């Protein structure tokens, strides 16, 4: 991969932030109703369309 433009870097940064797990305090607060993040993405298995 060559040079990344600033716009592409910004989009990849957003995707990286979205790719985190649900915080433990959210699981406790919702009494384990919310346990998984449907937007989780594996870097090798699925593409980011970038």
From Swiss-Prot:
Cystines in this chain: none
Composition bias type Basic residues, residue spans: 1-12
Q: Name one GO cellular component term.
A: ribonucleoprotein complex
SUPFAM superfamilies, alphabetized? Ribosomal protein L39e
User: Its GO biological process terms?
Assistant: translation
Q: Which domain of life is it from?
A: Archaea
Q: Which PROSITE patterns match?
A: RIBOSOMAL_L39E
Q: Where is this region: Disordered?
A: 1-21
Keyword field contains Ribonucleoprotein? yes
Q: Which family would the database say this protein is a member of?
A: Belongs to the eukaryotic ribosomal protein eL39 family.
The protein's name in its UniProt record: Large ribosomal subunit protein eL39
What is the organism of origin for this protein? Haloquadratum walsbyi (strain DSM 16790 / HBSQ001)
Gene that specifies this protein: rpl39e
């Amino acid at each position: 991969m060559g040079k990344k433009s600033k716009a592409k870097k910004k989009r990849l940064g957003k995707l990286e932030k979205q790719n985190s797990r649900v915080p433990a305090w959210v699981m406790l607060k919702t009494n384990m109703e919310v346990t998984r993040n449907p937007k989780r993405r594996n870097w090798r298995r699925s593409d980011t369309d970038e």
